[in-house]
Curated annotation (Swiss-Prot):
It catalyses: ADP(in) + ATP(out) = ADP(out) + ATP(in). SUPFAM superfamilies: Mitochondrial carrier. The matrix-open state (m-state) is inhibited by the membrane-permeable bongkrekic acid (BKA). The cytoplasmic-open state (c-state) is inhibited by the membrane-impermeable toxic inhibitor carboxyatractyloside (CATR). ADP binds at residues 104, 116, 261. The gene is ANT-G2. It is a multi-pass membrane protein. The transmembrane helices are not perpendicular to the plane of the membrane, but cross the membrane at an angle. At least 2 of the odd-numbered transmembrane helices exhibit a sharp kink, due to the presence of a conserved proline residue. PANTHER family: ADP,ATP CARRIER PROTEIN 1-RELATED-RELATED, ADP,ATP CARRIER PROTEIN, MITOCHONDRIAL. A motif (Nucleotide carrier signature motif) lies at residues 261-266. GO terms for cellular component: mitochondrial inner membrane. This is ADP,ATP carrier protein 2, mitochondrial. ADP:ATP antiporter that mediates import of ADP into the mitochondrial matrix for ATP synthesis, and export of ATP out to fuel the cell. Cycles between the cytoplasmic-open state (c-state) and the matrix-open state (m-state): operates by the alternating access mechanism with a single substrate-binding site intermittently exposed to either the cytosolic (c-state) or matrix (m-state) side of the inner mitochondrial membrane. Belongs to the mitochondrial carrier (TC 2.A.29) family. The keyword Membrane applies.
Length: 331
């Protein structure tokens, strides 16, 4: 079963921490083909889901945009956000920030491959030999360490994607955009905040990886023996359905972490910033209500469905034309 263990803690948004790493016996040529085809898969699925992804980010971060004077009034929902974005910025604007998101796949997968074996050897516990809790703890530790290590190198791309996606035409200032592209995001952030501006929210993102993995594996191991019994044990659809429900359940439970990290990103270059992720966790619910931590969660679920649907169709095309399915590009 495919495991979506990404940082869009959505974070957690959708990059498997150990996905698409080639088996040790696979040659360099085959790895290169898998790597590139996985990149095509990632580009296809991410580009198809990009409009929903941008709407999710706009709804999630709208309160920071209002504070900065870049949004005149809150969005009333997914449909309202789609309509206003297309009306104010044009249909093509729904893909704003997607290029950075697609580019992020390649270094993420290369880094995952580089780190995965090292951390798996370091926390190499077996469930049947060492017991469930050692295996569970080792899984969290290895996944968290590998995810954080990879994230350190690609976080600025995630930051850039977030700022571009939330760069709606200003409600004040004649409809001007704040950034002209990814390079401009880096240039202005470094000028105003230095390197720290590119990594705002990084610490809570690392926590999010561990929380998501803990919820995912904890729920799966608890529910599988209870729900998948009898004929359901060999039913692939039942296994997929359980995995899908748990993936979305873990993603929804850890969604506030994604909201906090992205809203911290949005304060780079602004006069008022959160002192820390804990300060953000306290301020946001206190001023806006607890539900503000879940803004955009509905769009996030739709994004996952759209991405998975397109990816499934693309996988079938690969089998039809190449006789096999390459890496699924989940990063």
């Amino acid at each position: 079963m495919t495991q979506n263990l990404g940082i869009s803690v959505p974070m957690m948004s959708s990059s498997p921490l150990f996905a698409n790493a080639p088996p040790e016996k696979k040659g360099v040529k085959n790895f290169a083909i898998d790597f590139l085809m996985g990149g095509v898969s990632a580009a296809v699925s991410k580009t198809a889901a990009a409009p929903i992804e941008r709407v999710k980010l706009l709804i999630q971060n709208q309160d920071e945009m209002i504070k900065a004077g870049r949004l005149s009034e809150p969005y009333k929902g997914i449909g309202d956000c789609f309509g206003r974005t297309i009306k104010d910025e044009g249909f093509g604007s729904l893909w704003r920030g997607n290029t950075a998101n697609v580019i992020r796949y390649f270094p993420t997968q290369a880094l995952n491959f580089a780190f995965k074996d090292y951390f798996k050897r370091m926390f190499n516990f077996k469930k049947d030999k060492d017991g469930y809790w050692k295996w569970f703890g080792g899984n969290l530790a290895s996944g968290g360490a590998a995810g954080a290590s990879s994230l350190f190198f690609v976080y600025s791309l995630d930051y850039g994607r977030t700022r571009l996606a939330n760069d709606a035409k200003a409600s004040k200032g004649g409809g001007d955009r704040q950034f002209n592209g990814l390079v401009d995001v880096y240039r202005k952030t470094l000028k105003s905040d230095g390197i720290a501006g590119l990594y705002r929210g990084f610490n809570i993102s690392c926590v999010g990886i561990i929380v998501y993995r803990g919820l995912y594996f904890g729920l799966y191991d608890s529910l599988k023996p209870v729900l998948l019994t009898g004929t359901l044990q060999v039913c692939s659809f039942a296994s997929f359905a359980l995995g899908w429900l748990i993936t979305n359940g873990a993603g929804l439970a850890s969604y506030p972490i994604d909201t906090v990290r992205r809203r911290m990103m949005m304060t780079s270059g602004e006069a008022v910033k959160y002192k820390s992720s804990l300060d953000a966790f306290q301020q946001i619910p206190a001023k806006e209500g607890a539900k503000s931590l879940f803004k955009g969660a509905g769009a996030n679920i739709l994004r996952a469905i759209a991405g998975a649907g397109v990816l499934s169709g693309y996988d079938q095309l690969q089998i039809l034309f190449f006789g096999k399915k390459y890496g699924s590009g989940g990063a």
